[in-house]
Amino acid sequence: MPRILDGNRVRDEIKGELKPRIAALAAHGRPPGLAVVLVGNNPASEIYVRNKIKTCHDLGIYSESITPPDTISTEELLAIVQGLNARAEIDGILVQLPLPPQVDTKRILMAVSPAKDVDGFHPCNVGALVANLPAPRACTPAGIMELLKRGGIPIAGQRAVVVGRSDIVGKPVAMLLLHEHATVTICHSKTPDLKSLCREADILVAAIGRAAMITGEFIKPGATVIDVGTNHVADREKAARIYRNSPEKMANFDKRGNLLIGDVDPVGVVEKAGAYTPVPGGVGPLTIAMLMVNTVASAERRAGVC
């Protein structure tokens, strides 16, 4: 059986490491502060924001959420961001994506002060990532690296294949792997013979947003498989096919009306991989944990205590 890379365990380790740093900041003057901007009432985004705010509360980080309506204009949202940039007690600003179509997302993300950009999306911080300079790293890619390192997975000299080229996951995780001396290939929808490329990977990262697309045929025996996907499958027939009619999984489907399935075939990965991240409970918990890491680090830099 392959080894499971347990994101919940690593998350708890990181939270334990953050607590004394947060206490030191509070003793120095004030705790770290995080502001989350959530536009409109997207149910999935609301869940993510609630989880972030709860984690802040658990750790002793000051947090607040700003919830403008989904009719907001780019200029109005820019004014909110600029106001948060100016507030001394706010160390981190997160603008929850996606934004409504009338809002210029790039302008909003560029308006966040690079020093308070705890998502790692500002061009200045992306440039620092490329140059391997200290700066906030995108949370999900940073979490993936923590899972690999704390899980004892060798990176240097390994062949890594990243399936997906998004600015949020694919590109930054490829760069982080490169900085750790892996040989990295990025694949996408136009990549020919994807299956054979994936089969060469010692570390395979799937971040494409398609449920169970990466089957066992894509996986090199013994490879480490990182599944970034979070796909809610509401088609019972499809869920049954993916889980090979597992009675336990189908009972869960009937209870909830859907199943959360990653980008990797959950049965095929068990048959082929040497280690893998489950969905849920793999990469997901680390995304919020690394947001907390970035917020605390920002507070330390701004307080001059790091």
UniProtKB/Swiss-Prot annotation:
Pfam families: THF_DHG_CYH, THF_DHG_CYH_C. Pathway: One-carbon metabolism; tetrahydrofolate interconversion. GO terms for biological process: L-histidine biosynthetic process; methionine biosynthetic process; purine nucleotide biosynthetic process; tetrahydrofolate interconversion. It catalyses: (6R)-5,10-methylene-5,6,7,8-tetrahydrofolate + NADP(+) = (6R)-5,10-methenyltetrahydrofolate + NADPH; (6R)-5,10-methenyltetrahydrofolate + H2O = (6R)-10-formyltetrahydrofolate + H(+). GO terms for cellular component: cytosol. GO terms for molecular function: methenyltetrahydrofolate cyclohydrolase activity; methylenetetrahydrofolate dehydrogenase (NADP+) activity. NADP(+) binds at G164, R165, S166, S189, T230. InterPro entries: Aminoacid_DH-like_N_sf, NAD(P)-bd_dom_sf, THF_DH/CycHdrlase, THF_DH/CycHdrlase_cat_dom, THF_DH/CycHdrlase_NAD-bd_dom. The keyword Oxidoreductase applies. CDD domains: NAD_bind_m-THF_DH_Cyclohyd. Keywords: Amino-acid biosynthesis, Histidine biosynthesis, Hydrolase, Methionine biosynthesis, Multifunctional enzyme, NADP, One-carbon metabolism, Oxidoreductase, Purine biosynthesis. Its EC number is 1.5.1.5, 3.5.4.9. The keyword Thylakoid does not apply. Homodimer. Catalyzes the oxidation of 5,10-methylenetetrahydrofolate to 5,10-methenyltetrahydrofolate and then the hydrolysis of 5,10-methenyltetrahydrofolate to 10-formyltetrahydrofolate. Belongs to the tetrahydrofolate dehydrogenase/cyclohydrolase family. This is Bifunctional protein FolD.
